[in-house]
Regions:
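Conserved N-terminal subdomain of the carbohydrate kinase-like
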Residues: 1-62, 231-248
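Hydrophobic anchor at the start of a short beta-strand
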Residues: 3, 85-87, 149, 166
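Conserved beta-strand edge residues that scaffold enzyme active sites
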Residues: 9-10, 94-95, 155, 229
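Short low-complexity, flexible loop/linker segments enriched in glycine and/or proline
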Residues: 18-22, 104, 165
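Structured loop/turn residues at beta-strand edges in well-structured enzyme cores
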Residues: 50-53, 113, 144
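Conserved phosphate-binding/catalytic region of the ribokinase-like
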Residues: 79, 130-248
Length: 248
């Protein structure tokens, strides 16, 4: 990890987050970010715009749109990025960071034409485009301007659509210990698949499997799988999850 572009905000405390673990599906989070968090105090002057423009992949979370000056900084970054390939918006909606859903919808709508990939669960898609049904949500994201829409559906799997391709991927089943971090693993595998030139089916299978691996472990960041580990489980589960996939 290259930290040359990390900035500090001396007037603000480092945020703290506590989580509780109630398997299989209840993992509440408690955020301490008052009066504000340093990440929401970023301004466009803090941004390495050349690095953002030239990055092979650029990922934002819509939480950064919840408050100024971070909101304007995100628009500056996306303006510099100018819809280059693999400009990704994580539709990560956390109600405690927003005034209301209407505000979140308005702000997220503004950035969808500026990104090429959007990723979210059904609730997050509903906030972004007013559609909770996976098919309609994916279509609405494509109509808003993205080139790849990925809708996470929990135990029902993942739907991914472009204007010419559709992939519906079942979950890779595991015994869940801690679901926290599974979304980060999913996103990391999406990035890896896109940068590696994998097919959409292989990329979504990898993302689903990476999330499953992390959810089967107690830790979060230290639970992230390596590529060999990921491919090993994908090969073991291919017949039941993605029987038509040949490039493993």
């Amino acid at each position: 990890v290259d930290d040359r572009h990390v900035v500090t905000k001396a007037a603000y405390n480092t945020p703290v987050t506590f989580c509780e673990i109630f398997p299989p599906d209840n993992f509440p989070l408690y955020f301490y970010r008052e009066p504000s968090a340093p990440d929401l105090e970023l301004t466009w002057e803090d941004l390495p715009l050349d690095a953002i423009r030239d990055a092979s992949i650029f990922w934002i979370s819509v939480t950064g749109l919840s408050k100024e000056p971070s909101r304007s900084a995100h628009h500056a970054a996306l303006g510099t990025r100018d819809r280059r390939r693999f400009t990704i918006a994580d539709l990560d909606y956390r109600p405690m960071f927003w005034k209301d859903k209407e505000t979140a919808h308005r702000e997220v709508s503004k950035i969808l034409p500026k990104v090429t990939v959007a990723i979210g669960n059904r609730e997050e898609c509903e906030v972004a485009v007013g559609e909770r049904d996976p098919e309609r949500a994916a279509d609405a994201l494509l109509e808003a301007g993205v080139e790849l829409a990925i809708v996470k559906q929990g135990l029902e799997g993942t739907l991914a659509k472009t204007r010419t391709e559709r992939v519906e991927m079942p979950v890779t089943s595991v015994t869940t210990k801690n679901g926290l971090g599974a979304g980060d693993a999913f996103g990391g595998a999406i990035c890896h698949g896109l940068l590696s030139g994998w097919s959409l089916e292989k990329t979504i299978f990898a993302a689903s499997t990476a999330g499953a691996i992390v959810s089967s472990r107690l830790e979060c960041s230290t639970a992230m799988p390596t590529e060999p580990e990921l491919l090993e489980l994908m090969r073991a589960r291919r017949d039941e999850v993605a029987p038509g996939l040949t490039d493993l």
